[in-house]
Design a protein with these regions (language model features):
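Conserved G1/Walker A P-loop phosphate-binding module
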Residues: 1-111, 127, 139-140
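C-terminal-of-GTPase-core extension/linker across diverse P-loop GTPases
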Residues: 2-6, 11, 17, 144-350, ...
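Glycine-rich, flexible loop/turn motifs
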Residues: 23-31, 38-40, 48-51, 80, ...
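Amphipathic alpha-helical transducer elements in NTP-driven molecular machines
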Residues: 32, 46-49, 62-68, 82-96, ...
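Conserved Switch II/interswitch segment of TRAFAC-class P-loop GTPases
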Residues: 40-45, 72-82, 93-155, 168-181, ...
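Short, well-ordered loop/turn sites that connect or cap secondary structure elements
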Residues: 92, 351-352
Length: 363
């Protein structure tokens, strides 16, 4: 899974990326300090995997990972190549979802390229650039469909679908907010459009603001925007998260406890990303390795096996599965077997989040 972190210059985007990866990407008080996208692989916190590792004490511990890409700052006119616009658009096209960092704090020492703090204006600037880029893509798709329709009339419907979408985009609305028949949306999804991507708005506040975020006027403004398009908002203080990320694990837990938090804002972002993209994890365990594997919700057992190795899917026989909670209550796989909690599932079994799995195959 790849998430692109976007935002106008000086909204806290690179600070948040530093916190996410603890990579120390240059964070400077001027536009375009992030010219090439910084990429960081982040482990997904999973207490279930930690528990399995405590039982098996494996040689290798492999959590699921998310790839975060810190994408260059954006300005008005990016869709026409202003600033670093073309680079921005090509980099964001390669992501699965967008984390849009929106400034929700006042600080006269940190210059805002558009003037004062205004979440609605900032969201509209980036949305407009992405929508304009999508309009260009859709216009090309209509042109291609019309040309193909000369030899095959089925393309007439495709042209009509994209013409209707173009009208929607012309109104300044994203593909995410577009409603149409499921089969038409499947067709639209083949076009690699930017505003179809799921989005999380990261409301970046100062420490005082995030401590009482529900009463933060900027946060409330951003929530209203997100609600209108079915997006999610995460209150976060990027500077605080950067400090937390720099601590050792034990110190981190103590610091969070002092703040009255059960988890960091980054952990919440990762979990929200999983939910947003419809992802779950299944687990494999043994003395050699305990590992979490990421799959789409609704994935069947053979395809899940294929995530481990193509031979597992090709020669799939069955999956031996125990729900994590059952395994934990029993204390071991052997005890779970004795209680008859380990099930044998066939090729039509749909995987559940937290399934502890052993695949049987023959090639």
């Amino acid at each position: 899974m790849k998430l692109g972190i976007v935002g106008l210059p000086n909204v806290g985007k690179s600070t948040l990326f530093n916190a996410i990866t603890n990579a120390g990407a240059e964070s400077a008080n001027y536009p375009f300090c992030t010219i090439e996208p910084n990429v960081g692989m982040v482990t997904v916190p999973d207490e279930r995997l930690d528990f399995l590792a405590s039982i098996y004490e494996p040689k290798k511990y492999t959590p699921a990972v998310i790839e975060f890409v810190d994408i260059a700052g954006l300005v008005k006119g990016a869709s026409k190549g202003e600033g670093l616009g073309n680079k921005f658009l090509s980099n964001i096209r390669n992501t699965d979802a967008i984390v849009h960092v929106v400034r929700c704090f006042d600080d006269e020492n940190v210059i805002h390229v558009e003037g004062g703090t205004d979440p609605k204006r900032d969201v509209e600037i980036i949305d407009l650039e992405l929508i304009m880029a999508d309009m260009e893509m859709v216009e090309r798709r209509i042109e291609k469909a019309n040309k193909n329709a000369e030899g095959d009339k089925k393309y007439l419907h495709e042209a009509e679908v994209f013409k209707a979408l173009l009208e929607h985009l012309n109104e300044g609305r994203s593909v995410r907010s577009y409603e149409c028949a499921p089969e038409d949306m499947e067709l639209i999804a083949t076009s690699d459009l930017l505003t179809i991507k799921p989005i999380i708005y990261a409301a970046n506040m100062d420490e005082d603001g995030v401590a009482d975020y529900e009463n933060n006027a900027y946060y409330q403004q951003l929530c209203a925007i997100a609600e209108a398009e079915g997006a999610q908002v995460l209150p976060i203080c990027a500077k605080l998260e950067e400090e937390i990320a720099a601590l050792e694990p034990e110190e981190r837990d103590m610091f969070l406890e002092e703040l009255g938090l059960s988890q960091s804002g980054l952990d919440r972002m990762i979990k929200t990303s999983y939910s947003l993209l419809g992802l779950i994890s299944f687990l494999t365990c043994g003395p050699d390795e305990c590992r979490a594997w990421t799959i789409k919700r609704g994935t069947k057992a053979p395809q899940a096996a294929g995530k481990i190795h193509t031979d597992f899917e090709r020669g799939f026989i069955r999956a031996e599965i125990v729900a994590f909670d059952d395994l934990k209550s029993c204390g071991s796989m052997a005890a779970a077997r004795e209680k008859g909690l380990v099930r044998s599932e066939g090729k039509d079994y749909v995987m559940n989040d937290g399934d502890v799995t052993l695949f049987r195959f023959n090639v």
